[in-house]
């Protein structure tokens, strides 16, 4: 599930989940959590289970880096549903974490979706251009 979908957050903190994505979902159950950077990650329930199980297997309560990941990704995760009108409700605490205002963009990354405030995403794109060039070059070096 890939693509970029611009949409608007309504006054109740809901956003329309794109019809193309909804058609590919196994059901209406999703999990939303903080992402890396100023975004939120949205997983299907089954992908979240695999992702979170893998994190839990490879982390320790006695390691600071593990605790950081668990506190930032696992703890804030919340189950949400696509409603009958195709919308998802973004919890207030997560809207604040990602700085979501009105105009947003949903990115399909294959493994999950990212939800960004549109202005923050555009800023990220500009700032990350040099890093993208380096990453693309590194992929070329390993045979892509």
From Swiss-Prot:
The gene coding this protein: mraZ
Origin superkingdom: Bacteria
Pfam families: MraZ (PF02381)
Biological processes, Gene Ontology terms: negative regulation of DNA-templated transcription initiation
Annotated compartments: Cytoplasm, Nucleoid
Molecular function via GO: DNA-binding transcription factor activity; transcription cis-regulatory region binding
Keywords: Cytoplasm, DNA-binding, Repeat, Transcription, Transcription regulation
Quaternary assembly: Forms oligomers.
Any one GO CC term of the record: cytoplasm
Repeat listed as a keyword: yes
Organism field: Treponema denticola (strain ATCC 35405 / DSM 14222 / CIP 103919 / JCM 8153 / KCTC 15104)
PROSITE patterns: SPOVT_ABRB (PS51740)
Alphabetized SUPFAM superfamilies for the sequence: AbrB/MazE/MraZ-like
Family in the record: Belongs to the MraZ family.
Domain SpoVT-AbrB intervals: 4-47, 77-120
The protein's name in its UniProt record: Transcriptional regulator MraZ
């Amino acid at each position: 599930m890939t693509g970029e979908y611009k949409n608007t957050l309504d006054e109740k903190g809901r956003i329309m989940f794109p019809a193309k994505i909804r058609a590919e979902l196994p059901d209406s159950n999703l999990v939303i959590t903080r992402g890396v950077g100023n975004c939120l990650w949205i997983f299907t329930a089954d992908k979240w289970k695999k992702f979170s199980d893998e994190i839990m297997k490879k982390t320790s309560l006695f390691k600071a880096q593990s605790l950081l990941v668990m506190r930032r990704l696992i703890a804030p995760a919340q189950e949400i549903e696509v409603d009958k009108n195709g919308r998802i409700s973004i919890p207030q605490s997560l809207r604040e974490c990602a700085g979501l205002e009105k105009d947003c963009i949903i990115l399909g990354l294959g493994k999950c979706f990212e939800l960004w405030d549109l202005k923050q995403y555009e800023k990220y794109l500009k700032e990350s251009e040099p890093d993208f060039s380096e990453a693309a070059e590194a992929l070329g070096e390993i045979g892509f």
